[in-house]
């Protein structure tokens, strides 16, 4: 649940920033491109956070999430950055486009062999550097309070 809430902070911010920041290449049918789409992306990204937890359980010894661990955070960070790059590779320029703006510059140019000429911008990448840290700190606080 907390992953969905963390994610909704940027999904709905992106929505409020409008087409100047990002726009859909493909519109959802039946007028579902606004809030419903952002809500579904928030739920999906909550699942991505949970997959990061699963990776920790798969590759690290127990006990987990009882105190700060660079290995736990490292796995969550690596997963967050990897999946963001993969999602951008698959969908950026095909489903959505983030505009190159002074405060959201292109930091990775279009990849050779890619089906799109759109580069990767700063804000979506930065989100997935910061968000796993917030999620991880929440997990530690949750474990401490139980």
Where do the model's predicted regions map?
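Aromatic-rich, lipid-facing transmembrane alpha helices and their immediate juxtamembrane interface loops
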Residues: 1-146
């Amino acid at each position: 649940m907390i992953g969905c809430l963390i994610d909704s902070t940027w999904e709905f911010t992106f929505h409020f920033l409008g087409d100047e920041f990002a726009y859909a290449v493909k519109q959802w049918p039946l007028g579902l491109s606004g809030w419903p789409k952002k809500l579904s992306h928030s739920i999906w990204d909550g699942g991505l956070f949970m997959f990061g937890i699963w990776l920790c359980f798969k590759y690290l010894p127990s006990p987990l999430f009882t105190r700060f661990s660079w290995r736990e955070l490292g796995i969550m960070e690596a997963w967050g950055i990897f999946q963001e790059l993969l999602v951008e590779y698959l969908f950026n320029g095909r489903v959505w486009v983030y505009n190159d703006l002074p405060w959201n510059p292109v930091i990775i140019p279009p990849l050779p062999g890619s089906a799109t000429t759109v580069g990767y911008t700063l804000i979506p990448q930065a989100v997935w550097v910061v968000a796993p840290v917030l999620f991880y700190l929440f997990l530690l606080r949750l474990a401490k309070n139980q």
